[in-house]
Amino acid sequence: MRAVVTGGAGFIGSTLADRLLADGHEVAAIDNLATGSVANLHGASATGRFEFVELDVRDQSIPAVLERLRPEVVFHLAAQADVRVSVDRPLFDADVNVLGGLNVIEGARAAGARKVVVASSGGTIYGDPDPSDLPVDETHSQHPISPYGVAKKVIDDYLFAFRYLHGADYASLALANVYGPRQDPHGEAGVVAIFAGRLLADEPCTVFGDGEQTRDFVYVDDVVDAFARAALSGEGVRCNIGTGVETSVNLLYRTMADAAGVADGPVYAPARTGELQRSALDPSFAGEVLGWRPTTSLTDGALATLDWFRNR
């Protein structure tokens, strides 16, 4: 299979590229390097079956590049991925995540790709669900409360429309809180990368609010396994990719601190306005249509993440 990964120099995208190459496929990565890094591509570049294209997904040449590459599958992971930026700069967010996404989807269709697999956001497209609905499944109403979540929902709607109009196949993977090696603790990072960087630097970690807010933390290798499976299974579907388990920020901190050999507790700061209190995604449907399930425990994932940060 020949595949294109947009956002291919990023945390998840580069890990996906490595997985696809390990499976024997040819891979081209497209990335503007705004947040991605060529350092993430060293292993891929050594395979002889990899090409890197430095390009923004909003660029008008995207369709021509995809026409030249002629991929069977396009994995669209490039994004403006910071919810706070989307609130402060909604036009910029829509430019990248809606118009950029549509540019890729239309380019893939015109280039004859048999499928587009996109990274959606299970943490935002469902809005702020009632705790009694957790873990949420794919039948839950979608009422996103951030421009970022709105943009992700819009792309799902475009994919549905393109399948109806053109027969263009797709899978949309609604990701929980992804963590693991290569996540940037100084960029659009999740709390795991931030904690890892600070714990290893012997710096205090800040927890906002009382720390009892929950998230569904899913390890990056499990996530890219879902993407690889979605290239082959699941027609016109949206699947939640998470563990179904709520983990409090306090428990996450203690797990990571213990793994790092740090006895001290975190520093608590006032809660941030608008932050979701609880979140978890039901992955059962992904098990049915993709044959996927998460296999990495939080403890094992935290250890692997800390090891990577320690040795990079």
What is the predicted function of each stretch?
Residues 36, 88, 96-99, 139, ...:
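Residue-level signal for the nucleotide or nucleotide-sugar donor/cofactor binding architecture
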Residues 154, 158-162, 195, 252, ...:
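Hydrophobic alpha-helix immediately C-terminal to the catalytic Tyr-X-X-X-Lys motif of short-chain
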Residues 16, 56, 181, 197-312:
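C-terminal substrate-binding subdomain of Rossmann-fold SDR/epimerase-dehydratase oxidoreductases
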Residues 45, 78, 108, 187, ...:
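Hydrophobic aliphatic residues
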Residues 34, 39, 192-193, 224, ...:
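Short alpha-helix within the catalytic core of nucleotide-sugar-dependent glycosyltransferases
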Residues 1-178, 304:
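N-terminal Rossmann-like NAD(P)+-binding domain of SDR-like oxidoreductases, especially those catalyzing
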